[in-house]
Amino acid sequence: MSLQTNHRPVLVVDFGAQYAQLIARRVREAGIYSEVIPHTATADDVRAKNAAALVLSGGPSSVYAEGAPSLDAEILDLGLPVFGICYGFQAMTHALGGTVANTGKREYGRTDINVAGGVLHEGLEACHKVWMSHGDAVSEAPEGFVVTASSEGAPVAAFENKERKMAGVQYHPEVLHSPHGQAVLTRFLTEIAGLEQNWTAANIAEELIEKVREQIGEDGRAICGLSGGVDSAVAGALVQRAIGDRLTCVFVDHGLLRAGEREQVEKDFVAATGAKLVTVDERQAFLSKLAGVTEPEAKRKAIGAEFIRSFERAVAGVLEEAPEGSTVDFLVQGTLYPDVVESGGGSGTANIKSHHNVGGLPDDVEFKLVEPLRDLFKDEVRAVGRELGLPEEIVGRQPFPGPGLGIRIIGEVTEERLETLRHADLIARTELTAAGLDGVIWQCPVVLLADVRSVGVQGDGRTYGHPIVLRPVSSEDAMTADWTRLPYEVLEKISTRITNEVPDVNRVVLDVTSKPPGTIEWE
């Protein structure tokens, strides 16, 4: 069961753009709830959602191409405010009787637009930069629409019809390369559509707690698998606030954690929430399963399978200790909105992917899922966590893979190698925090090349130690990422400390590969 919000959504119609989720996030950053729906949605689907407004996303096609995605024409007759972006701007124009033409002037990248009045660009420079990505262009606006911007390749780069509460732009306001884009989107939502900005962390937390309370009921009991990450911690905190000690949190220590993570869960999380916590020490079980395993996918499968078995044992223990006559019927998961959209759940179809921190469960244990975060993006989860009083060490934590340090050791995973990597990782994290860079990077995997020996000189002799790789990346959603340009003095400090303080390491290297082509994790 999902916990649907009471807010009327702004529906972002996805025409196949890579930016549909980003648009939805930008709408929420404006303080208004949003959801993504496919362009195949009908007017009846939109009515059923009780939409507050529509935003039509960009897309890869020409509106004249065979099989080009189109919009149910009836949707534009529902009387809802509509904002078109790039392809969505052209599709809207086409549907409303305007003209979309192949001008022969393509625009890709930063482009100057010239503004001529209107609500969207009021107070902005008469000529300013935006991010364009189009071949066709609107040459004539639909009847009743006022043209408010143009560029060299787009005679109609923006238009508005305040009476119908409709507007659109040829450029991409949702990307950071359009410096005024967020202001333009917000103006549509608030000044043209007339929507209230009431999607805040405080409102979200209060609403979700009440929804959880309704779903689980007055006597229901729940289990939450904690991974040490942000999502499961915030999900657990929300449910604990809703049902108190009828929630049991389970934390499996698989021995592949970073320094201090078990203690952080056992002390900081419990202190902040008052949650009942069961910790299961499975370190030796995982190490024995990983003995001799070097192939990355085999490692992941071994870790995943053992985690399922460990969680099963922990769940069995919780069920045995439940008060006589009571049952534990609910399982809390930290599913986020991107998981829902990517699995097809955004259209009300398909099943939701299970989280790696829970995995499978025994056939004879059937839980009802509680997914309090399934309508939220990662930045909103962090904001709700802060609202619930979770410490910054938890809510500001960098993403960390389910298989843990096991996939950051290139080669066989052993206790000795884990200690080496744990030490190096702690130094890197400590120095990045001290330099105030935690908010700059998305994450910084630290990788041990355990099957590589590097010649070095330490003291007066030659050494054969292992290299450590630093992989700092910047990203908004982990779908794409760029390597972070860290200050040289910070890199120098990390390198010096690691080679001086971590035994058997004599070289530190920097990974400067973007994603694509390289993934964020090495394995």
UniProtKB/Swiss-Prot annotation:
Question: Is Ligase among the key words of this record?
Answer: yes
**What reactions does this protein catalyze?**
XMP + L-glutamine + ATP + H2O = GMP + L-glutamate + AMP + diphosphate + 2 H(+)
Where does the GMPS ATP-PPase domain start and stop, copy by copy? 199-397
Q: In which pathway does it act?
A: Purine metabolism; GMP biosynthesis; GMP from XMP (L-Gln route): step 1/1
Question: Which protein is depicted?
Answer: GMP synthase [glutamine-hydrolyzing]
Per its UniProt record, what Gene3D superfamilies does this chain match? 3.30.300.10, 3.40.50.880, HUPs (3.40.50.620)
Biological function: Catalyzes the synthesis of GMP from XMP.
Q: Name one GO cellular component term.
A: cytosol
- The organism's place on the tree of life at top rank: Bacteria
The entry's keywords: ATP-binding, Glutamine amidotransferase, GMP biosynthesis, Ligase, Nucleotide-binding, Purine biosynthesis
Q: To which species is this protein native?
A: Corynebacterium glutamicum (strain R)
Binding residues for ATP: 227-233
Q: Which NCBIfam families match?
A: guaA_Cterm, guaA_Nterm, PRK00074.1
- Quaternary data: Homodimer.
Positions of the catalytic residues: 86 (nucleophile), 172, 174
Q: What InterPro entries does the entry give?
A: Class_I_gatase-like (IPR029062), GATASE (IPR017926), GMP_synth_C (IPR001674), GMP_synth_GATase (IPR004739), GMP_synthase (IPR022955), GMPS_ATP_PPase_dom (IPR025777), NAD/GMP_synthase (IPR022310), Rossmann-like_a/b/a_fold (IPR014729)
Documented EC number(s): 6.3.5.2
Cite the Glutamine amidotransferase type-1 domain residue spans from the record.
9-198
What GO annotations for molecular function exist for this entry? ATP binding; GMP synthase activity
